[in-house]
Amino acid sequence: MATITTLASSVPLFRPYSFPGGSSRKPKKDNLSIKPPATSSLKVNAKLASADDTSSNFNKDNWLASADELSRSFPPGFLFGGGSASYQYEGAVKEGGRTPSIWDTFAHEFPDKIADGSNGDVAVDFYHRYKDDVKLMKKIGVNGFRFSISWTRILPSGKLCGGVNKEGVAFYNSLINELLANGIEPFVTIFHWDLPQGLENEYDGFLSGQIVNDYRDYAEVCFQEFGDRVKFWTTLNEPWTFCYNGYVNGSFAPGRCSTCTAGNSGTEPYLVAHNLLLSHAAVAQLYKNKYQASQKGQIGIVLVCFWMVPYSDCPYDCEAAQRALDFMLGWFLHPLTYGDYPESMRHLVGERLPQFTEMQAMMMKGSIDFLGLNYYTSIYAANNESPNPHDISYTTDSRVNLFQKRDGILIGPATGTPAFCFCPEGIRDLLVYTKEKYNNPIIYITECGLAEANINTVDQGVKDVERVEFYYEHLKFLRSAIKKGVNVKGFFTWSLLDDWEWNSGFNVRFGIVYIDHEDGLKRYLKYSALWFKKLFGK
């Protein structure tokens, strides 16, 4: 992930966003049917700790030294890795038997929706350069690499009946073997938004329940071909982002929304999310029943959430922050933990929110061995006291307004992605909240990163001291969360390489390795990569 679009009442996540409302406003009493809580566990600024080891000692003039402070902070076996995704990295979209995904179609048919008009046809050419990139990983010292499998490289028709593509299987087998030979654990995502265009054409993809069987068939091929070596599987990457940007505002593939050429922002996001959850449950059940005992791996899911800070200490704003968490994280994690959607969603969305059968709820509940959690920023959440009754949309259903500013002051320093302010304490607060709300799951931070914009030269790009500071601060607050009992087992940077960032194109850079688009996509280690190298003792 790693970009955002437009934010309205409930958060969106990935791709540059414009935020609703002004920078300041006084909360008013809600005239809706929801009653405010007498007390709330969500306090303004959500400062869960002060007398811990999170004070900043970062020195920009001696940035490398800060790695020493954290070098022995994490337990043995802790995974440190870099993240990637197939469409953002691989390129070679017409090679090796691969067929188009919805992102190929979207980027080519709607170049105006991509900031620089680019696409992922070449991306960073990982398909041809993966062996050299694995050498870079080993040089940096990471012991994990998160990547996704391209559905249409494995099943070009999207369906098992259309045949398995041996070239695609061979590519991922070679990548996995290369990683393991270099002491790097593969951490594999089965679906990272690149749905086969053929399935979108046939039955509208995840809008149809037919997707569950096709997705399960695809996942089973992955288990059969790669499961003897892959010990960490995630079924879905950020289903919230897929639903919000794909079906609420139309900024991502497949580009559907109420004001788009097709779509309904008040119904389709909920239907797509429901089918994503059912697909996850079917695949998790398949893996646990048929493959886990012999392959000895684990299966989870990757979710994303901002930390929601109440706009004021008014009880209505505290409750709004809780609703915002429900509508972003709880939308998916609540069914996976408790078998149903959060009560706030059931109350506010009503009959537009699909229901699980008793059997589906049983399949869903407890279906993850671990949770992948992506964190980028925090945001203020305020009660929306006067929702437009004619605007029926996911963005208004939560009755929350989100703000980056309070009294004209940003919640944290600005970054290269307008939607993401620098709020490192939020990673601790979100982790502690997840522990307490959702039964203390095993957690891997599967994405966390800083975007930089307007970086066009190697010399400028490699000197990313701000990114070093970003990771230093976030890892300190992550360490604090671990000391508070959160069961965190790993941390993956977003991203390993500067990549193609969805609707931001190549305009922003998240990598710890610089990609020179002016000189044949040459790779250069940034200061942040050298910092991690020292952190790992390499």
UniProtKB/Swiss-Prot annotation:
Gene3D superfamilies: Glycosidases. Residues 18-37 are annotated as: Disordered. One of its GO terms (biological process) is carbohydrate metabolic process. Optimum temperature is 40 degrees Celsius. Stable below 50 degrees Celsius. InterPro entries: Glyco_hydro_1, Glyco_hydro_1_N_CS, Glycoside_hydrolase_SF. Expressed in young and mature leaves, but not in fruit and stem. It is found in: Plastid, Chloroplast. A beta-D-glucoside binds at Q88, H192, N237, E238, Y376, E447, W494, E501, W502, F510. It is an enzyme of class 3 (hydrolase). Its EC number is 3.2.1.161. Residues 1-66 form a transit peptide. Disulfide bonds join C257-C260. The keyword GTP-binding does not apply. It catalyses: 7-[beta-D-apiofuranosyl-(1->6)-beta-D-glucopyranosyloxy]isoflavonoid + H2O = a 7-hydroxyisoflavonoid + beta-D-apiofuranosyl-(1->6)-D-glucose. The active site is at E238 (proton donor), E447 (nucleophile). Disaccharide-specific acuminosidase, hydrolyzes the beta-glycosidic bond between p-allylphenol and acuminose with retention of anomeric configuration. Has highest activity towards furcatin, and lower activity towards beta-primeverosides and beta-vicianoside. Has very low activity towards beta-gentobiosides. Belongs to the glycosyl hydrolase 1 family. This is Furcatin hydrolase. The lineage of its organism: Eukaryota, Viridiplantae, Streptophyta, Embryophyta, Tracheophyta.
